[in-house]
């Protein structure tokens, strides 16, 4: 502790402007770096706080035009840019949240640390901005290159609302990011990461290099912010910059998605989805990567979590074209839709007994997309689809009845693509649609008027299409009902079906 006291007394003195030459600045920053880098378990909290104050005074006292210069010789004198980079990394680590052993999400000490560190970063970036206008200080570019990565990670860690942030720390982090973009002459975060022009290679590789030690199986949970920084950063990078980093971004994304916590699974799947839609198919197919992605995503479909299912199905729908390309290239055109068949079969298996409304809604929301992708091959699943459609039309989904609207959309698509198989199902489908119209007309379902109106229109369209698929059978069956029915809404729908024109979606598909 005596040594700490001596350092605290002498830490600022060696950096006074009167001695502001680079050889004097380097040892002063090295001492502060040593104090910041001590293990947290050694009870040096007070010394660390004192080191932050000393660092702030040192930055303010140093001369701007000499701040980034250094000899880079003399053994331990590595040059100011490199030392500044190490100091900035130590500061970023100091302000980072840590995993709580008891599972508590709150990090009450982190926002204050982040606010202090953020103000130091603002001072450092201010020095860079001042040095840019000085023709006698070209070394600022080297200094900024060492600093920009850790400063960016700090800003992204603390700028959004998280368990380890406060309004004050979020504000400071936002200011740090804005100043960093201004100093690096970047118009956006994407420009900062990928480069603003052909000569600027960007800093995405640098950021990935800094995150890599914290994104392996043993370390990725020690800092709860790392996964968010990685995910957010990844999604700022688009084609054609992402594919060259595929080997670095795919393993962490798979690792995060394979976690037992649903939140992490969703985050990982979102990363995988961005990779699927951004990286060219040829790169995804190399080394069987696309197949690895498919199996990782397929396994998530067994988890009854609607947010996860939503993310997985969206990703799979974008992955199918990539997998189909591989089979086309192999000449196996008969099996190009194998993966889509597998997923739809599993979805229908889960949909039949499912009683949770959120999951039912999520499954139904994506059912039309699967029917569109399979087209006429949907006929393989027609029996299962019929059972799901009939069952789901009986249960309302307040307040907008999204589930039944999507089921009606699915039914229309099924009839369009598989119209030769529909006549034998006319009576069953007609009963289900009429029951739905009666329920809506009697106001027995607590949904909005707009939803009721839309459902009546969709159900009527389904009846018209069903009539065309059955070559007029529906009109004949409805004729007697129209005479005896006293419900004006039902009669109106029947009249629309009877007056249906020859043009219908069914006519467009008969030539397929």
UniProtKB/Swiss-Prot annotation:
| Function in brief | Regulator of the DNA damage response (DDR). Part of the TTT complex that is required to stabilize protein levels of the phosphatidylinositol 3-kinase-related protein kinase (PIKK) family proteins. The TTT complex is involved in the cellular resistance to DNA damage stresses, like ionizing radiation (IR), ultraviolet (UV) and mitomycin C (MMC). Together with the TTT complex and HSP90 may participate in the proper folding of newly synthesized PIKKs.
**Organism of origin:** Mus musculus
Q: What is this protein called?
A: TELO2-interacting protein 2
Task: Tell me which Pfam families the record gives.
Answer: Tti2
User: Which residue ranges are recorded for the region named Disordered?
Assistant: 1-23
Q: Which Cys-Cys disulphide bridges does the record give? A: none
Q: Where is the composition biased (Basic and acidic residues)?
A: 1-10
Oligomer status and interactors: Component of the TTT complex composed of TELO2, TTI1 and TTI2. Interacts with TELO2 and TTI1. Interacts with WAC; WAC positively regulates MTOR activity by promoting the assembly of the TTT complex and the RUVBL complex composed of RUVBL1 and RUVBL2 into the TTT-RUVBL complex which leads to the dimerization of the mTORC1 complex and its subsequent activation.
Family note:
Belongs to the TTI2 family.
- Gene Ontology annotations for the cellular component aspect, listed alphabetically: TTT Hsp90 cochaperone complex
Taxonomically, the superkingdom here is Eukaryota
What SUPFAM superfamilies is this protein classified in? ARM repeat
């Amino acid at each position: 502790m005596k040594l700490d006291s001596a350092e605290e007394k002498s830490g600022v003195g060696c950096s006074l402007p009167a001695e502001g030459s680079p050889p004097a600045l380097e040892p002063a920053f090295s001492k502060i770096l040593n104090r910041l880098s001590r293990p947290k378990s050694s009870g040096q909290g007070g010394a660390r706080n004192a080191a932050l104050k000393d660092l702030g005074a040192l930055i303010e006292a140093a001369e701007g035009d000499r701040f980034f210069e250094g000899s880079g010789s003399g053994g331990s004198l590595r040059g100011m840019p490199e030392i500044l980079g190490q100091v900035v990394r130590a500061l970023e680590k100091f302000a980072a949240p840590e995993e709580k052993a008891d599972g508590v999400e709150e990090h009450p000490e982190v926002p204050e640390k982040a606010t202090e560190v953020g103000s130091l970063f603002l001072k450092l970036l201010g020095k860079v901005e001042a040095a840019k206008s000085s023709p006698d200080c070209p070394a600022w570019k080297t200094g900024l290159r060492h600093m920009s990565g850790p400063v960016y990670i700090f800003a992204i860690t603390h700028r959004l609302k998280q368990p380890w942030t406060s309004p004050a720390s979020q504000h400071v982090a936002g200011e740090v990011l804005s100043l960093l973009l201004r100093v690096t002459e970047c118009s956006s975060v994407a420009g900062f990461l990928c480069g603003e022009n052909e000569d600027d290679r960007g800093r995405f590789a640098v950021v990935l290099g800094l995150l890599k030690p914290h994104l392996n199986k043993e370390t990725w949970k020690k800092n709860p912010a790392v996964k968010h920084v990685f995910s957010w950063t990844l999604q700022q990078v688009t084609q054609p910059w992402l594919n060259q980093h595929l080997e670095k971004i795919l393993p962490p994304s798979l690792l995060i998605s394979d976690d037992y916590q649903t939140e992490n699974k969703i985050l990982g799947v979102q990363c995988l989805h961005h990779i699927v839609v951004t990286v060219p198919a040829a790169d995804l197919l190399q080394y069987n990567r696309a197949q690895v992605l498919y199996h990782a995503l397929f396994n998530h479909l067994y988890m009854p979590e609607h947010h996860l299912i939503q993310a997985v199905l969206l990703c799979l729908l974008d992955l199918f074209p990539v997998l189909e390309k591989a089979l086309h290239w192999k000449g196996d055109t008969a099996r190009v839709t194998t993966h889509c068949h597998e997923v739809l079969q599993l979805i229908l298996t889960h949909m039949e007994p499912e009683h949770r409304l959120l999951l039912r809604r999520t499954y139904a929301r994506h059912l039309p997309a699967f029917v569109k992708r399979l087209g006429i091959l949907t006929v393989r699943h027609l029996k299962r689809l019929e059972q799901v459609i009939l069952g789901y039309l009986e249960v309302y989904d307040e307040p907008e009845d999204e589930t039944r609207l999507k089921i009606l959309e699915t039914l229309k698509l099924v009839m369009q693509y598989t119209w030769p198989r529909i006549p034998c199902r006319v009576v069953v489908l007609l009963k289900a649609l009429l029951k739905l119209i009666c329920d809506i007309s009697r106001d027995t379902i607590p949904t909005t008027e707009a939803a009721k109106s839309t459902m009546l229109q969709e159900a009527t369209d389904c009846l018209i299409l069903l009539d065309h698929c059955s070559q007029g059978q529906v009109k004949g069956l409805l004729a007697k009902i129209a005479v005896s029915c006293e419900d004006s809404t039902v009669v109106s729908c029947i009249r629309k079906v009877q007056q249906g024109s020859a043009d219908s979606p069914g006519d467009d598909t008969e030539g397929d």
